[in-house]
Amino acid sequence: DKLKTAGQTLETLRKEYETKASRHQVLDEIDKNMAGFQSSLKSVIMADRQGRLSGIRGTVADIISVDKRYTVAIEIALGGIMQNIVTDNEEAAKRSMRYLKENNLGRATFLPLTSVKGKMLEVGGLSNENGFEGMACDLVEYDGLYDGIVKSILGKTAVVEDIDTASFIAKKYGYRFKIVTLDGQVINAGG
């Protein structure tokens, strides 16, 4: 009995380690790829605070909040999009791009509130599947002002309990949408 319990404990710890190691690897990769991007992001935010730019709302990471249970899944679903800059409109985005270019400060991706219009994928029966947690856009909190942006970036991503559930749902629904597990594993649309 003690041996069986020890074996189960070992298996649980092994799974926890694999999950954390996988998350660490993903975050490292994001960090490496974002090295140049981070400075441009900071430059835009600082220029906005100093009054040299206007119409900057912040990053995607700034406009959403996530329950602890879904943090890993949402971070993985968003990836580098977390660092995209939300602006009031296209003009604010263009001014920011010109500012970055004129000052050789790198590049950034902008999401103007007035032009990014997202819709949530509606798949009949999906909410009844065992292990289905919700569509990613429904698992984050945000001001209604950002509805179009949040649905654009998270409205076609389902969050599920585990990889077995993800595989089952992906096959059943023809790989039509991205699926992320609570521990950060991904099955992309199209397979």
Give the residues covered by each predicted segment.
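Residue-level encoding of the coiled-coil heptad register
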Residues: 1-7, 11, 18, 25
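Conserved short loop/turn motifs at secondary-structure junctions
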Residues: 8-12, 86-89
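Hinge-like oligomerization/junction regions that interrupt long coiled-coil arms in large cytoskeletal
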Residues: 19-191
